[in-house]
Amino acid sequence: MTALIFDCDGVLADTERYGHLPAFNATFEQFGLKTRWSEEEYGEKLKIGGGKERMASLFDDPAFAREVTGDRSELVATWHKTKTAIFKQLVADGKLPPRPGIPRIIGEALERGWTVAVASTSAESSVRAVLSHAVGDATAARIPVFAGDIVPAKKPDPAIYQLTVDRLGLEKADTLVIEDSRNGLLAAAGAGLRCLVTVNGYTKDEDFAEAVLVVSELGDPGRPPIEVLANRGAARPGPYLVLDDLRACLEGGTVENGGGR
């Protein structure tokens, strides 16, 4: 049976620019911290896997470390809890619509009997909120979510994808990961899985040499045609991706050349 594993942030919705970044900055303000990340600075922080880890990186600045005292683990945990609540409110307020093609592809995949899952090292409650907003509560209830600190290491470590495959009993040869970043791609490839990448503003210039297909978005009927940035598989995309394109991404190739088998 074919399986699709979706990353959350930047894949289900454009959460980084319009959700996580403002939530981080609102948290910093709420706790009286002077830090405010610009879009460019946050783009650099995205190279660090995990929200708590990004917050912890503030202490790499000696001036910040001198000003902010206390147990760093406790501080970061408190900040991150607040940031997660702010982020979830942004989702509830409708600030983060799904990326094109997400509701359509997920709905059609479930109708065809494919397994659909979400694997992310973001906070589980945030991931579930984004998923429910993207596809609706009824559809989201049919989709297993593996997220948060369920694994000890963040992407690019492959642990989250290996766990998802093991828990669901998936065949790697029949499983396609949909990611948006190089860290996510490396995590998928490290787990021996083929990966389709839908880029976003933060990741469009990253190296996706291991991806079987790289596109601007999944696309939808009535929208401008998608841009195919790289195609190392058997898919022959039209103006938007369909399930047959995703299935074709699993045909032939190896992990090293963008395949996955």
Feature locations, PLM:
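A general structural motif
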Residues: 1, 113, 172-174
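Conserved G/P- and acidic residue-centered "switch" motifs that form tight phosphate/ATP-binding loops
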Residues: 7, 11, 120, 180
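A structural preference for short, pocket-lining loop segments at secondary-structure junctions
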Residues: 114-115, 120
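Asp-based, Mg2+/Mn2+-dependent phosphohydrolase catalytic module
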Residues: 107, 123-261
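Residue-level signature of catalytic and energy-coupling elements of molecular machines
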Residues: 24, 120, 188
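N-terminal helical cap/lid subdomain that shapes the substrate entry/recognition surface
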Residues: 2-100, 107, 111-112
